Each structure stands twice: as structure tokens, then as C-alpha cells.
A protein has these predicted regions:
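Hydrophobic, aromatic-rich cap/lid helix
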Residues: 190-218
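Conserved hydrolase catalytic core segment
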Residues: 103-143
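Flexible "cap/lid" loop of the alpha/beta hydrolase fold
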Residues: 131-166
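Conserved loop-alpha-helix segment in the C-terminal half of the alpha/beta-hydrolase fold
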Residues: 226-261, 266
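Conserved HGGG/HGGXW glycine-rich cap/lid loop of the alpha/beta-hydrolase fold
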Residues: 33-79
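Active-site loop/oxyanion-hole signature of alpha/beta-hydrolase fold enzymes
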Residues: 68-108, 112
Length: 282
């Protein structure tokens, strides 16, 4: 009987150890891993977008690269996590790269994902091989106010309250009205709106407010890797402002789309893929 009790205790202890030490590390995103190549690409979608935004892009590179496609926690139906913030997400992606021993990946980000790509390359300059920023700026708020300075303690509670107070129809209508200003391809409109509608409202409000407070204009001077900056066609009219924002990024190569809006991968696909191919293969 004594021997039996000892065996039971040993079994329970082993089970406890397996439960504690066998748990996978948590990251503020879901990952879909595809492709099979020695070199890797990490795709970071934009605000409230699904990793599916990269589906067509991935197809062009999966034969030669291992692709890691993220969807951030709380966006597009992915389970939210407590305390979302731009800095936490940046560090989470960097930790994922280190923990999985992904050697010098190419990091491609759209919109807020482009901001994250800049921040990762700036704060972890030895971690990435190249970055591609798809229609993002170092400081979104400075586009309308060049003297903008980010707040050290940024209170996002009002924005969160505003977003969570909307009913389903109000939120859907808001997204339906906003999206045509960001996406010219009507065939993709409902899909992109649906990603927003499926997003967690608290995360939506918190990250909208937090990202608008981000200022990377000085930090990007730390970036050492080659950097391709793809911008929507309208931004050519604001080129002096764009150049000023990016003046500290010495490795930047700027390309302006010929047509379309913020979702360049949908609105000027052939041009977009050509730029990616040329940059990645160089």
C-alpha cells in the first residue's frame, strides 16, 4: 500500500511538472506558419486586420521562404489579451523571433504593422535582415501636426468607452463608411469591414489611441537593415512631409504606388508585388 501511495505521488508530481514546464509561451498574436525555405518572412497586418490580408502576398513567396503570418490578439476574431499596447506587441514579436531562432527574417508590415516593423528594427537592430513598410509613417499624428509630441502617460479610456458603447449596427456602419477611404477595390470591402467588426472593441479603442500616440521619428535612426517604404499614391503630394518624417532612416528606399489607397496590396497588386520581389531578391 505504501509503495502504491508513493507511485501515485510520483505520478501526480510528474503530471504537475509537465503541466507547468510544458506550457507554450504566450505571445500577443496568432501565427500561421507556411512555406519551407531557409530564409524567413514575418507578415504583420494593420490595424484590426486579419493575417489573411497577406494571402496573395504569401503565395508569391512560400516556395522559397518560410512564412510566419500574424494576426494580433483582439483583432479579426482572435482572442483578446489583457493590456494591449504598441510596445508590448513590438516586444512580443521580437521575443517570438528570438525564441524560435528565426535568423534575420524579412519583416513586412502594413499600416500599424508597418509601424511595428520600424519599431522592431529600431529597438532590435541585430534581429532582422530587412523590413518592408507598407503605407505607414513613423508618427501618424505628426502628419497633421509636425510639432506633435507623444504623451508619456496616454489615457485611452475615453476612446475605449466610445468604442465599447456602440451597438453592433453603429460599429458596422462606422466601419462601412470609413473603409472606402482606405480601400479602392470594392470586391474586398466587405471582407475588410468584417475583420474590424469581429475585432474586440476594447482592443480596438486601446490600440487606436495608443498607436496615434506613437512617435518613431528619432528611434528609426537606430535601424541598420535595408528598408523598403511603399506608400499609397496620394502621399506623393505630401513628399516633403514624408521625407521629413523619415529623415533619420538612412537605409530607406521610397516607392509611391501608381493608384489606389491604403491597402496597396489590393489596389495596385502588380506594382506592389514587383517592388517586393525586387527588394527581397536583391
Amino acid at each position: 500500500m505504501k509503495k502504491y501511495i508513493i507511485l501515485v505521488i510520483a505520478f501526480l508530481f510528474s503530471a504537475l511538472c509537465l503541466n507547468v514546464f510544458g506550457q507554450t509561451k504566450s505571445y500577443p498574436f496568432e501565427v500561421v506558419k507556411t512555406g519551407n525555405g531557409k530564409k524567413s518572412i514575418i507578415f504583420i497586418p494593420g490595424f484590426a486586420s486579419s493575417g489573411e490580408v497577406w494571402n496573395e502576398t504569401k503565395t508569391a513567396f512560400e516556395k522559397n521562404f518560410t512564412c510566419y503570418t500574424l494576426t494580433m490578439a483582439g483583432f479579426a476574431g482572435v482572442k483578446p489579451q489583457p493590456n494591449p499596447s504598441f510596445e508590448n506587441w513590438k516586444n512580443g514579436i521580437a521575443n517570438y523571433i528570438k525564441d524560435n531562432k528565426i535568423e534575420k527574417p524579412i519583416v513586412i508590415g502594413h499600416s500599424m504593422g508597418g509601424g511595428l516593423a520600424l519599431a522592431i528594427a529600431a529597438d532590435y537592430p541585430e534581429l532582422v535582415g530587412k523590413i518592408v513598410v507598407v503605407d505607414a509613417l513613423p508618427c501618424l499624428a505628426a502628419l497633421s501636426d509636425p510639432s506633435f509630441q507623444s504623451k508619456e502617460n496616454n489615457d485611452c479610456s475615453a476612446m475605449v468607452t466610445q468604442m465599447t458603447a456602440m451597438n453592433e449596427k453603429q460599429f458596422y456602419d462606422m466601419q462601412k463608411q470609413t473603409m472606402p477611404r482606405l480601400l479602392a477595390d470594392q470586391s474586398k470591402l466587405e471582407m475588410v469591414v468584417d475583420w474590424s467588426v469581429k475585432s474586440d472593441r476594447t482592443t480596438f479603442g486601446q490600440m487606436y489611441c495608443d498607436f496615434f500616440n506613437v512617435d518613431l521619428r528619432e528611434r528609426i535612426s537606430n535601424i541598420k537593415c535595408p528598408s523598403l517604404i511603399l506608400l499609397e499614391s496620394y502621399f506623393i503630394n505630401l513628399k516633403p512631409v514624408i521625407d521629413e518624417q523619415y529623415k533619420n532612416l538612412k537605409t530607406a528606399d521610397f516607392k509611391y504606388a501608381n493608384k489606389g489607397l491604403h491597402f496597396i496590396m489590393y489596389d495596385d497588386t502588380a506594382w506592389y508585388l514587383e517592388q517586393l520581389n525586387n527588394f527581397i531578391k536583391a
